[in-house]
Regions:
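Short beta-strand segments enriched in small/hydrophobic residues
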Residues: 89-92
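Class I S-adenosyl-L-methionine-dependent methyltransferase catalytic core
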Residues: 1-75, 94-108, 132-148, 153-394
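Short glycine/proline-enriched loop/turn "hinge" motifs that connect secondary-structure elements
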Residues: 76-83
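Phosphate-coordination loops involved in phosphoryl transfer and adenosine-cofactor binding
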Residues: 84-87, 207
């Protein structure tokens, strides 16, 4: 059993877990965490979880003092005879305590181990939970002597203590975002971890190719290939095709990976797939046209115009590819939703007209459709994630 510390938007993180491991094997533990019961659990492949840990202790009801006593008892016994120096970080979630309380637990372990001849370095806690950067840079969870304890309390006071298996590799994610040869802020910057989440939302790795018909600079293509998936990418702009090609070649050289790729120029609303592409494509993952960016909510007339334009382009795209794709194809499409001053969202009309376009929306068990929105607090244009399947022909 593993527990994951979900990202800034927990609903997206648990949706990703449900699609990878099945609703029967995933459940909410608290508002920020999920439990995963699967032998196939692989934290490295996730985009929507900041950290994960293997569950080692469970307490039916308790507070920090209860958890602290168990931790001190368990780990002083476990590490008493270890010759190597231990690096320890402790992160608490769901407790109303101070960072000093967390540090006291670590210092108590350190003192008891010192008495038995074992050396321990304790990572300081500016907050009650170490941030992802601190966990990652200290390599916590990546070896038996670099340990982070994730101590999580649920609203019903149940407590889980887990040993981290790693934190999100923010260095590699940043490199794939910023260090690649070509980026273009004008066309929008799809974060690599969101691209990874969207790929995972299309389901576990299966035969066939992934196609991104709005590939831009190639972020989805890169993340898919790192998961071992063969890809097609296309874009209306030849400049984007050139940029994506250059980025894919950079990825080949940096990571020495094998999955095949092909990038070509095509208008998603009019593209005609060849026979090989039709037979090979089993999933479509893309960020569709989001319209112009806004720094403040637009006036109603402007919003109506932009919304209508985006709706037209994305509807044309979906209608164009429907007769060309396999009925078993899974689509994960990011479309725009606009947030007003009160936090209310305006959605595309096509979301209520999917059947007319030949699609049905996939509904998840652990989150509602309305929760599949990705945005930052200051953003007007959010990305709404649509999980789609073609309607059966008959």
């Amino acid at each position: 059993m593993h527990i994951t510390i979900l990202g800034r938007q927990p609903a997206l993180g648990i949706a990703e877990l449900e699609q990878l491991y099945g609703a029967d094997n995933v459940r909410w533990f608290s508002q920020q965490t999920a439990l995963v019961d699967s032998p196939d659990f692989d934290f490295e492949t996730l985009g929507g979880s900041q950290k994960a840990g293997r569950v080692v202790l469970e307490i039916d009801r308790g507070n920090w003092l209860t958890a602290s006593r168990q931790i001190v008892q368990h780990y002083t016994a476990k590490w008493r005879a270890i010759e190597h120096k231990i690096t320890l970080g402790i992160s608490a979630y769901g407790f109303k305590i101070s960072p000093r309380d967390v540090q006291k637990t670590g210092l108590l372990i350190k003192k008891k181990l010192r008495d038995s001849g074992t050396s321990l370095r304790l990572i300081p806690n500016p907050e009650i939970a170490l941030n992802t950067a601190a966990s990652h840079h200290n390599k916590l969870g990546l070896s038996p002597t670099k340990v982070e304890l994730l101590v999580v309390r649920a609203p019903n006071n149940r407590i889980i203590i887990a040993e981290s298996v790693g934190a999100q590799n923010i260095t590699a994610l940043a490199a794939r975002d910023q260090a690649r040869p070509r980026t273009d802020a004008f066309v929008g910057m799809l974060p690599p971890k969101l691209a990874r989440m969207m790929i995972n939302l299309s389901g576990d790795t299966k035969p066939g190719r992934l196609w991104d018909p709005f590939c831009g600079t190639g972020t989805v293509l890169q993340e898919a290939r790192l998961k071992g998936i063969d890809v097609y990418g296309s874009d209306l702009s030849q400049k984007m095709v050139d940029y994506a090609t250059e980025n894919m070649q950079w990825l080949d050289n940096k990571y020495q990976i094998n999955p095949q790729w092909q990038v070509f120029q095509a208008d998603a609303t009019a593209v005609k797939l060849n026979a090989a592409q039709k037979s090979e494509i089993t999933r479509i993952v893309c960020e569709a046209y989001l319209g112009q960016p806004f720094s403040a909510p637009p006036k109603p007339a402007k919003l109506t115009a932009v919304r209508g334009n985006c709706n037209h382009i994305i509807s044309q795209f979906l209608a164009n590819i429907r007769p060309q794709i396999n009925p078993s194809t899974t689509l994960v499409v990011a479309v725009p939703a606009w947030r007003d001053h009160s936090g209310k969202f305006t959605h595309l009309p096509l979301i209520d007209q999917l059947a007319d376009l030949g699609y049905r929306r996939l509904h998840l068990n652990l989150v509602s459709d309305e929760q599949l929105l990705y945005y930052r607090e200051n953003q007007v244009v959010a990305r709404e994630i649509l999980l789609l399947k073609p309607l059966d022909e008959n």
